[in-house]
Amino acid sequence: MSLNEFEFQVAGIKLHGQYYSPQLVKAVVLLVHGLGEHSKRYERTVVPFLTKNSIAVISFDQFGHGNTKGKRGHHPGYSFLLDAIDQMISKAGKLFPEQPIFLYGHSMGGNIAINYCLQRNNSIKGLIATSPLLRLAFKPPPWKMTLAGILDKIMPSITLPSDLDVNAISRDKSEIVAYELDPLVHDRVSTGYSLEIMKQGEWAIEHAPEMKIPMLLMHGTNDRLTSHLASEEFASKASDTVEIVLFKGGFHELHHDLEKEKMLEKIRRWIESQIQNSK
């Protein structure tokens, strides 16, 4: 497997990306990470598993995250998040011509990936969403939502602590330690970022019947960060192109949780079935 890094521009901001290429490539996964983390966190489990199975991976650090320039936890607008995926799909097509491209989004990245497929390009072969942030698994205090609404009108770029419960990401304690020690992980989010993500999550649920792309949706039933019930609602409203898999007792980061091997194997089998179905 070879690793190559690159930069690209969206909204005048340089975003950092990389792609991982196995010797034999039969498909490409475009990976979209979640809030407060970065794309290289997937190098421990997801990337080696996929490349070992002849699936190339291309990923990038979103606005305000990882090695991408800009204010931590803030983006210039939701449409620019979709523009970044447009550019990455174009790059993936040039790097791996005629190979099927699958979009894979986790948490906030799942929100963005789902909305991309509903609102924009439908040329990708399939969509994978893990623990997508369609709704939070908890209700923020009313005062906090009121404050966020006020700040969004006067200072939408101001960032506040995300208050993410680190212990909720995985049942594997070593993963919690790794998360806390990662220098590129942060806990900042702007009011404009968080409110727009939640708005787009509700929009996605409402428009779920319009999903035309084959989709694999996975969520843990003990996810305390994003709502597995919202994922179930999305799947129930969508057509039969959406397959939902629930992991009983699973925490937020299924790819770092106790059943990660089972979860990754499901992704592999699903990708291969989509490739076979298109022949």
Positions of the model-derived regions?
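N-terminal cap/lid segment of alpha/beta-hydrolase-fold proteins
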Residues: 1-22
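Short beta-strand element of the alpha/beta-hydrolase
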Residues: 26-34
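The serine-hydrolase catalytic nucleophile loop
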Residues: 35-47
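Catalytic nucleophile-loop/oxyanion-hole region of alpha/beta-hydrolase
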Residues: 38-39, 66-96
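Conserved alpha/beta-hydrolase
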Residues: 49-70
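Short beta-strand/loop motif that positions the catalytic acidic residue
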Residues: 211, 217-219, 223
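Short alpha-helix in the alpha/beta-hydrolase fold that links the catalytic acid
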Residues: 213, 227-236
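Catalytic active-site module of serine/aspartate enzymes centered on a nucleophile-bearing elbow/loop
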Residues: 243, 248-279
